[in-house]
Regions:
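Amphipathic, well-ordered alpha-helical segments in soluble domains
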Residues: 32-36, 53, 60, 83, ...
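Alpha-helical segments in soluble extracytoplasmic regions
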Residues: 38, 42-65
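Non-transmembrane, amphipathic alpha-helical segments
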Residues: 18-25, 49, 72, 76, ...
Length: 125
């Protein structure tokens, strides 16, 4: 009986600890990604963004994405890849007006993903 109760408490503590870590990691990763995307958006508005700016953001995303796959479904992260690839294509061609909406979509997705997978009553029911 005592072992069962101890096992239940240990399991509960592990679940809570992993949940807190997951929320922290996802939120900080997307916060950092949003800040980087906002700087790219600003540079694109000024038409000073380069393809290299975009590839450095993609490198950041690729590094973080592998760990995010543990917490977030593949389809949510895949949409980020598609939008980033299109934005990079427009930056490569220096079509800044076409790149801006793609970066806006990336900013929107980066804002909604953490909220969709955060522990909250609206995500339970």
């Amino acid at each position: 009986m005592i072992r069962t109760i101890i096992s239940i408490f240990i399991t509960f503590a592990l679940i809570v600890t992993l949940s807190v870590y997951e929320m922290y990691y996802v939120h900080t990763t997307f916060r950092d990604y949003t800040e980087i995307l906002q700087s790219l958006y600003h540079k694109t508005e000024l038409q000073t963004a380069t393809y290299e700016d975009g590839t450095s953001i993609r490198a950041f995303w690729e590094k973080k994405k592998h760990r995010l796959h543990v917490w977030i479904p593949h389809t949510s992260l895949q949409e980020m890849d598609y939008q980033m690839d299109e934005a990079l294509g427009f930056l490569y061609q220096q079509k800044y007006e076409d790149a801006l909406p793609k970066i806006e979509v990336l900013l929107g997705i980066a804002e909604t993903i953490p909220h969709n997978y955060t522990f909250g009553i609206e995500n339970i029911f």
